């Protein structure tokens, strides 16, 4: 990226100023091997602004009156779901997750569950049951350091600022002014300067999240590498104790029947020792494993079981006495009802004066077979392909992690370094780009195998999708799903995935292809069961044939089998879902050159194209809005001709016509080029006003030819570059004019240009409040808008626009590793930990395209005729 823009260089230079998140750091230590770029925060930092989730009290009176019917229908449905059926709502508008400004990098790979570790070192967000979260900080889950000189313990400290009511026999209250956290996902560092001890600890946390890797990236493991630097004039014995409670901090931990046992695992001359914590609920039992690597000069000891709700003096004194644990043999007894158990592993070594040593520890979990909420089908996770599905893989997983993490780090650095070493890119962007990838693992993500006895007919559905490569793709790469958001519990929400899919197609393209095959199957199938939709109260079938679904299901039900968990609108009438499928097929082919995929998707694209044409009611090449919220902005009503929905058919025609050309179907290509040309003429005549499209008295992201700054033309600009011809849907001058208008009004005129782009802005500089969504900033949409700006040469403006969102979310509001869907200028946010901000990878694609790094499309083999 030799020329990414003068503004980016200036921004990078400006970031040499100390981060506001590090102002309370009083230590001198910088840690060992800590990355230069990323998100860094002193453990003593506190965020001054604490926002509240959007609630009923934030709804203007006019909207309350407008949506009385919705409120009554939702409340009736909510009571039935939560009080009678004893299930949780797919979107719980009455009990939003409260904001906790504590989260750091999640642990674990893709699809095997995650355990999030906070930036102060706590274990605080759990998603082992697929798609279902609990937010309990488990106080017993800690690292403790013991220092000994000349046979005497001189320092023993829990590396936590907490002062809990349990385990009061331990030494709590570490001074956070002498430690900091640094995240560059999938790695993180915690640096502790031990006051008065001349010893610095650097804990490097590594999870196996590796682009284009479909084995190790699936593993439910994380490694903690403790780098110990001894600044003393004498040797020091250092012990690190890792304690862990059996369970996830829920009531189930005390349900009884859980037990622990020590283990050793030796292979290829490498030995690992630790404790297994067997957690035995009726549904989705699992085993946790804590372990350390034994090697010359490193000893590993353990405590099999202790009471984490008591004083903890026995464990503390055991470590204090000699820097070791007693290592009893044999299993612990199963817990009684109401009893909770925990275990600990300790790694010890001698560090020479002014020297350095390393201790390696791991956390693994093995929940190989899972039920979703309905408990109808048993699903086997991806990692079981390599480690078995019997529930006994935790020792092997631990050993594999501790003997392969160095290889993982080499691959991670080879992937990240070209971006990190590019001085043209601002540091905040490097942090955002990699840290937003947390959602790939911590988005309720599930990655499962298809059953070995599964046949194509089982996957195709009753209608028979006719996808010849469906079975080979799913057999080789499994099925992948992630939530719209941790609070919006629907898998593979397609209008949102449209934005986020850049991360998948650029980093794990086979998962994107697998996901698309699953969507294609649902397109040609239907679910005729009637149900009432909450927004309008009308009754319609769950899923119509030949339209793209909203989502592939709720983890509280049975995903893939029952789709469209979204109950607010009948999305068969949404205008954007079909567009987004066709454009993704075209984009995926363009970036992967997978001609077999394109051939398989072609008839499905034909089906959704025919469904989309019915929305052009006057045959002018433009789609008319239906007078209701009929696209991804599901609470923002536009009537008649806006500029968003009309562009849908134009983009569809462009993308579909380009695919037809690739497949040699000249008749289809000509048909849709005619529709495109007709639509362009009508758009110019009816909607273009010279600076942005006609929008009455508003300048809205929705109303410019970008199409809500992300849901159409910005991605069209990125995806519609077939054969390198550039965007042929709109004149370059129109696109630049629209982008400049948006930048001036929606970015610079909102919050002083420091919070990204507001969805809607009036000409007088006041955010549009006509809808609950019009005066929100949607982070993922803003990243997409920034990508479009970069694509069109407005590099400085693109970075400025996106930077506002990053600074707001990560530095001001304390929402690291839980980027919300939306926030307003003041007071509120909506939907923490949301999928759409993965769209920041569209910025990276735009940068690579500008540098000429994006691949050129590959033509299909000679002689191929379309299906």
Describe the residue ranges of each PLM region.
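Acidic/polar, glycine-enriched structural segments that form the non-catalytic walls/loops
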Residues: 12-88, 189, 194-197, 202, ...
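Solvent-exposed N-terminal domain segments of exported/luminal and surface proteins
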Residues: 13-34, 91, 96-101, 105-106, ...
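Short, solvent-exposed loop/edge-beta patches enriched in aromatic
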Residues: 106-115, 119-121, 135-141, 145-155, ...
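A generic secondary-structure signal for well-formed alpha-helical elements
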Residues: 114, 118-119, 230-236, 244-252, ...
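Non-catalytic C-terminal accessory modules of carbohydrate-active enzymes
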Residues: 122-124, 130-134, 138-204, 211-214, ...
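Aromatic-rich carbohydrate-recognition surfaces in CAZymes
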Residues: 144-149, 154-157, 166, 230, ...
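Active-site acid/base region of carbohydrate-active enzymes
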Residues: 175-189, 198, 266, 270-330, ...
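Active-site core of glycosidic bond-cleaving carbohydrate-active enzymes
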Residues: 493-524, 603, 636, 651-666, ...
């Amino acid at each position: 990226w030799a020329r990414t823009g003068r503004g980016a260089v200036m921004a990078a230079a400006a970031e040499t100023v100390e981060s506001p998140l590090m102002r309370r750091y009083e230590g001198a230590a910088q840690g060992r091997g800590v990355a230069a770029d990323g998100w860094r925060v002193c453990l003593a930092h506190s965020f001054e602004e604490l926002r509240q989730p959007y609630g009923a009290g934030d709804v203007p009176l006019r909207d309350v009156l407008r949506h009385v019917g919705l409120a009554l229908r939702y409340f009736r449905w909510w009571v039935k779901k939560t009080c009678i059926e004893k299930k949780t709502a797919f979107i719980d508008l009455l009990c939003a997750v409260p904001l906790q400004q504590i989260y750091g990098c999640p642990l674990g790979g893709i699809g095997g569950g995650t355990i999030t570790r906070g930036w102060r070192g706590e274990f605080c967000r759990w998603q082992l049951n697929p798609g279902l979260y609990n937010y309990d900080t488990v106080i017993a889950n800690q690292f403790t350091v013991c220092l000994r000189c000349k046979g005497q313990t001189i320092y023993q400290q829990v590396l936590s600022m907490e002062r809990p009511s349990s385990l009061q026999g331990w030494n709590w209250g570490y001074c956070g002014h002498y430690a900091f956290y640094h995240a560059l996902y999938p790695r993180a560092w915690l640096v502790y300067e031990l006051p008065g001890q001349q010893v610095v600890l650097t804990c490097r946390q590594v999870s196996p999240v590796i682009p284009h890797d479909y084995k190790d990236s699936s593993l439910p493991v994380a490694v903690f590498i403790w780098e110990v630097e001894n600044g003393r004039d004498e040797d020091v014995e250092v012990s690190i104790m890792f304690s862990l409670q059996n369970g996830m901090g829920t009531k189930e931990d005390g349900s009884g029947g859980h037990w622990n046992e020590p283990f050793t695992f030796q292979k290829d001359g490498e030995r690992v020792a630790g404790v297994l914590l067997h957690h035995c609920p009726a549904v989705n039992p699992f085993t946790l494993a804590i372990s350390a690597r034994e090697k010359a000069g490193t000893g590993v000891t353990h405590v099999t079981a202790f009471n984490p709700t008591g004083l903890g003096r026995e464990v503390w004194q055991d470590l204090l006495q000699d820097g070791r644990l007693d290592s009893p043999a044999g299993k612990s007894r199963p817990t009684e009802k109401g009893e909770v158990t925990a275990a600990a592993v300790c790694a010890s070594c001698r560090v020479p004066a002014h020297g350095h040593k390393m201790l390696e520890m791991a956390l693994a979990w093995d929940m190989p077979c899972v039920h979703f909420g309905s408990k109808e089908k048993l699903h086997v996770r991806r990692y079981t392909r390599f480690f078995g599905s019997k529930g006994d893989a935790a020792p092997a997983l631990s050993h594999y992690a501790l003997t392969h993490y160095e290889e993982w780090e080499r691959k991670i650095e080879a992937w990240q370094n070209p971006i990190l070493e590019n001085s043209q890119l601002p540091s905040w962007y490097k942090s955002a780009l990699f840290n937003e990838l947390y959602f790939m693992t911590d988005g309720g993500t599930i990655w499962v195998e298809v059953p070995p006895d599964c046949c194509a007919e089982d996957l195709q559905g009753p209608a028979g999708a006719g996808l010849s490569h469906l079975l080979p793709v799913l057999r080789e790469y499994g099925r992948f799903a992630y939530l719209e958001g941790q609070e919006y519990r629907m898998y593979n929400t397609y209008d949102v995935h449209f934005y986020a899919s850049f991360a998948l197609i650029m980093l794990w393209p086979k998962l994107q292809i697998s996901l698309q095959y699953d969507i294609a199957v649902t397109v040609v199938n239907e679910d005729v069961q009637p149900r009432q939709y909450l927004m309008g109260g009308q009754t319609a079938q769950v899923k119509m044939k030949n339209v793209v679904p909203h989502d592939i299901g709720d983890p509280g039900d049975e995903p893939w089998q029952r789709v469209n968990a979204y109950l607010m609108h009948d999305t068969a009438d949404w205008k954007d879902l079909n567009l987004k499928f066709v454009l993704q097929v075209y984009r995926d082919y363009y970036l992967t050159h997978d001609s077999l995929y394109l051939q398989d998707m072609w008839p499905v694209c034909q089906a959704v194209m025919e469904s989309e044409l019915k929305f052009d009611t006057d045959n002018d090449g433009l789609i008319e809005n239906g007078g209701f919220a009929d696209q991804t902005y599901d609470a923002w009503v536009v009537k008649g001709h806006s500029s968003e929905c009309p562009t849908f058919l134009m983009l569809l025609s462009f993308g579909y016509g380009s695919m037809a050309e690739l497949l040699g179907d000249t008749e289809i290509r000509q048909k849709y080029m005619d529709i495109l040309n007709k639509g362009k003429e009508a758009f110019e005549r009816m909607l273009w006003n010279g600076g942005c499209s006609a929008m009455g008295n508003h300048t809205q992201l929705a109303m410019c030819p970008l199409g809500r700054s992300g849901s159409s033309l910005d991605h069209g600009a990125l995806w519609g570059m077939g054969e390198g011809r550039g965007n042929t849907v709109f004149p370059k001058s129109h696109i630049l004019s629209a982008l400049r208008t948006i930048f001036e009004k929606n970015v610079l005129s909102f919050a002083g240009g420091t919070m990204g782009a507001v969805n809607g802005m009036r000409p007088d500089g006041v955010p549009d409040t006509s809808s609950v969504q019009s005066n929100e900033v949607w982070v993922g949409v803003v990243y997409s808008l920034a990508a479009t700006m970069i694509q069109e040469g407005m590099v400085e403006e693109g970075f400025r626009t996106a930077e506002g969102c990053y600074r707001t979310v990560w530095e001001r509001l304390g929402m690291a590793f839980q980027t919300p869907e939306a926030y307003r200028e003041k007071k509120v946010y909506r939907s923490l930990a949301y999928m759409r901000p993965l769209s920041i990878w569209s910025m990276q694609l735009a940068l690579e395209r500008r540098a000429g790094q994006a691949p050129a499309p590959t033509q299909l083999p000679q002689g191929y005729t379309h299906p």
